[in-house]
Swiss-Prot record:
<keyword id="KW-0343">GTPase activation</keyword>
<feature type="site" description="Arginine finger; crucial for GTP hydrolysis by stabilizing the transition state">
    <location>
        <position position="425"/>
    </location>
</feature>
<dbReference type="Pfam" id="PF25442">
    <property type="entry name" value="Ubiquitin_RHG40_C"/>
</dbReference>
<dbReference type="GO" id="GO:0051497">
    <property type="term" value="P:negative regulation of stress fiber assembly"/>
</dbReference>
<keyword id="KW-0597">Phosphoprotein</keyword>
<dbReference type="GO" id="GO:0030054">
    <property type="term" value="C:cell junction"/>
</dbReference>
<comment type="function">
    <text>GTPase activator for the Rho-type GTPases by converting them to an inactive GDP-bound state.</text>
</comment>
<feature type="region of interest" description="Disordered">
    <location>
        <begin position="180"/>
        <end position="234"/>
    </location>
</feature>
<feature type="compositionally biased region" description="Polar residues">
    <location>
        <begin position="221"/>
        <end position="231"/>
    </location>
</feature>
<feature type="modified residue" description="Phosphothreonine">
    <location>
        <position position="164"/>
    </location>
</feature>
<dbReference type="InterPro" id="IPR000198">
    <property type="entry name" value="RhoGAP_dom"/>
</dbReference>
<feature type="modified residue" description="Phosphoserine">
    <location>
        <position position="70"/>
    </location>
</feature>
<dbReference type="InterPro" id="IPR008936">
    <property type="entry name" value="Rho_GTPase_activation_prot"/>
</dbReference>
<feature type="compositionally biased region" description="Basic residues">
    <location>
        <begin position="37"/>
        <end position="49"/>
    </location>
</feature>
<dbReference type="GO" id="GO:0007165">
    <property type="term" value="P:signal transduction"/>
</dbReference>
<dbReference type="Pfam" id="PF00620">
    <property type="entry name" value="RhoGAP"/>
</dbReference>
<feature type="compositionally biased region" description="Low complexity">
    <location>
        <begin position="63"/>
        <end position="76"/>
    </location>
</feature>
């Protein structure tokens, strides 16, 4: 019997440990009520791979040629099954020791209507203003930055939400035109956009919106972007927003996607960065260019015959994955940790909108089930939410981004286990694992746990248990069905990478940072493959059941498909770990626009507030005029004091604390750092300080941005002239 999957785990030559079935017997997805490890006996959340019993294998929807089967793939399947059995045994053992609590019980899917899910989606992407009706600056600013595909995705969800509300509400009062049959205008001119938005492509002038220029071209840059309820004047400044009763959603612009910054397209590519820099062996000669400058959903929409792709063969060998050549623009590349917390929150909102629009382009609905929130434990280590662990750890180290206990597990394995054969296939000593778990829960936060006595095998076992027992999966399992549908349409690895890239950007901060550290750690394990026999395929096979789990009920066949896809996703994460956590530049451009729009909107007082506060404001202005001499604001004073093309860089931690630097088209961030290093090279301590220093742009249209050493500062200066420039760790 052969069960194969081109999208993840290769299921070949499966050998049942039970009695062999008669020849010709077909695999079946039967009920497992009689199985000793049935649902009732597993109090913990239902793992997506619990279905891999010896009698319930069923072919997934993917197929592979028989020539691709190998002994290695059969061994990988056996590893997968052993990991499932280990999870089942640990789950049963835990249930016998203590009764399940409400926090640990499986959360069942609640029957909810589509409107509730769309309302939750709108809240998750930062558009709760559309539900509450409040004129919030952040929501309006976010809407003003959306591309065509992103705006269409928001409109679609908002329409579903409003339609559901109308069905729930009582019969509305009949319109006078319904009574007398008056119809003076065609239906297309009816004014119902406050409750439902249509998908027409015709552009209409909106009341209260000032337009000063013709429609934007497709290659418009950031400097020519028109914001919702506002426009640019000829000098590039924004015209003040007009007050009125314009609905927030009416102002969603039908704008083209823009390149990052104002640099010409021909000059945008300064150098290339290949994933081969990080995985330098067994790379095929074919390579594909990967751009972060253009919205992925816009790129997919413009692809001809995107629904007629030929299915790509996904083989076991890691070297057959596409080699990507990444465009490195004049603004450099940005890691997730290079941006401020507030800006990363905006990135997360935009990424979820972009991910939804990306799947919409393929006709795939990004469905999410509404489940009961599992709170988890408030203390200890295992079963505690990542956010709670980080809150406790930040009392010791405010800068920590990955739970300290997880870092200890990594360190323990790296000390003596990287060359240990089958390090993540071994189960370790059960008695010791149980003892260490209890001691960690009781003593770790008090720094009383003795790490010297722990073996690397037990550390590896507890690392898997740590992720398996999280209240919620490290990676959202609800995205997997959409990823399965994407793979069934047969797009190449590049499209799969783009979907996965947006998934990573949409993760909560704690999950995203932890996942990055985990993938970096596993790549260290894979680097010692010749000694530990743990390659990319083995790691993804063993870790899939621990990193992805579902609290929803699925048939065994569905869960098999979910498991295979989860394995493939981990494999992609491991292969492209160095580039998946780089923020796409088109999202950074949208964040800059959003910050500019927020500052503009905050200057505008609602008409009612203006009316109520007019006398108070006039009195305050008169007092200021008589008591103080008008002074320039710090930003205007700074701009007037510093000539064009000259920036003042501050280095508060160095002996040379400030320096004015004349920029030219070739000045890079590393050149500025080199100048400060030369000026502060009098002592060895100053030299050590400079090794950890980076150049930041702070303020203006960005919260804080740690610049790539290869970024051209004049280009950054042009898109953010009001920023301050600071050198710090």
């Amino acid at each position: 019997m052969e069960v194969e999957d081109s999208g993840g785990v290769v299921l070949t030559a499966y050998h049942s440990h039970a009695r062999s079935q008669p020849q010709g017997a077909e695999p079946r997805c039967a009920s497992r009520a009689s199985h000793p490890l049935s649902r009732k006996s597993i109090p913990r959340c239902r793992r997506i791979n619990r279905m891999l019993s010896n009698e319930s294998l069923h072919p997934p929807s993917f197929s592979r040629s028989n020539s691709q089967a190998s002994v290695d793939s059969s061994a990988s399947m056996e590893e997968f099954l052993r990991e499932i059995e280990s999870i089942k045994e640990s789950s049963v053992g835990a249930s016998q020791e203590q009764p399940p609590t409400a926090a640990a019980a499986a959360a069942e899917v609640k029957p909810v209507d589509e409107g509730e899910l769309e309302a939750e989606w709108l809240q998750d992407v930062g558009l709760s203003t559309l539900i509450s009706g409040n004129e919030e600056e952040d929501g309006k600013a976010l809407l003003s930055t959306l591309t065509r595909t992103q705006a269409a995705a928001v409109k679609k969800r908002y329409n579903t939400y409003t339609q559901t509300l109308r069905k729930k509400n009582k019969q509305p009062v009949r319109d006078v035109r319904d009574i007398f049959g008056v119809s003076e205008s065609p239906p297309s001119d009816s004014c119902e956009h406050a409750t439902q938005l249509d998908g027409t492509k015709e552009e209409k002038d909106l009341p209260g919106v000032t337009k000063t220029s013709r429609p934007l071209p497709d290659d418009a840059s950031l400097s020519s972007t028109t914001l919702s309820n506002g426009a640019q004047d000829e000098e590039g400044g924004f015209v003040a927003l007009q007050s009125g009763s314009v609905s927030i959603l009416e102002a969603i612009p039908d704008i083209a996607v823009h390149t990052n910054g104002s640099a010409d397209a021909e000059q945008s590519v300064q150098s290339t960065l290949s994933d081969d820099d990080y995985h330098g062996k067994n790379v095929p000669a074919e390579a594909e260019e990967l751009s972060f400058e253009v919205s992925y959903s816009e790129m997919v929409t413009e692809m001809p015959d995107r629904n007629k792709w030929k299915k790509s063969d996904i083989k076991k060998e890691d070297y057959v994955l596409t080699k990507f050549i990444i465009q490195k623009t004049r603004f450099g590349l940005t890691e997730t940790g290079d941006l401020s917390v507030e800006d990363m929150k905006k990135i997360r909102h935009l990424s979820l909108i972009e991910l939804t629009a990306f799947f919409d382009a393929f006709g795939i609905q990004l469905k999410r089930n509404k489940t009961e929130r599992v709170r988890g434990r408030d203390n200890g280590i295992f079963g505690v939410p990542l956010t709670v662990l980080l809150d406790n750890d930040r009392k010791k180290d405010p800068a920590v981004k990955v739970p300290l206990v997880l870092q200890k597990f990594f360190q323990k394995v790296e000390e003596s286990g990287l060359e240990s054969e089958g390090i993540f296939r071994l189960s370790g000593c059960t008695a010791k694992v149980k003892q260490y778990r209890e001691e960690l829960d009781a003593r770790f936060n008090a720094d009383k746990f003795k790490w010297d006595k722990m073996c690397h095998r037990e550390a590896a076992v507890m690392l898997k248990a740590f992720f398996r027992e999280l209240p919620t999966s490290l990676f959202p399992v609800e995205y997997i069905p959409a990823f399965i549908s994407l793979m069934e349409r047969g797009p190449d690895i590049k499209v799969q990478f783009q979907a996965l890239h947006l998934m990573v950007m949409a993760l909560p901060d704690a999950n995203r940072d932890t996942a990055q550290a985990l993938m970096a750690f596993f790549n260290k394990v894979i680097a010692n493959e010749s000694k530990n026999r743990m390659n990319l395929w083995n790691i993804s096979t063993v870790m899939a059941p621990n990193l992805f789990f579902s609290r929803s009920k699925h048939s065994d066949c569905e869960e098999l498909l979910l498991a295979n896809t989860a394995t493939h996703i981990i494999r992609l994460m491991l292969k492209y770990q160095k580039i998946l956590w780089k923020v796409p530049s088109f999202l950074i451009t949208q964040v800059r626009r959003m910050n500019e729009a927020t500052m503009l909107l905050k200057k505008q007082l609602p008409s009612m507030k203006k009316l109520l506060r007019r006398k108070t404001l006039d009195r305050e202005v008169s007092i200021l005029k008589t008591s103080k001499v008008p002074q320039k604001s710090p930003s205007s004073r700074r701009m007037s004091d510093v000539p064009e093309g000259v920036i003042r860089v501050h280095a508060p931690l160095l002996s040379k604390v400030s320096m004015a630097i004349q920029l030219n088209s070739q000045t890079k961030a590393k050149d500025i750092l080199a100048k400060f290093q030369y000026e502060n090279s009098h002592g060895s301590s100053e030299h050590i300080k400079m090794q950890n220093q980076r150049l930041y742009e702070v303020g203006g249209n960005i919260g804080q941005h740690c610049l790539d050493p290869d970024a051209y500062i004049l280009d950054v200066y042009h898109i953010n002239p009001h920023a301050e420039w600071v050198i710090k760790p």
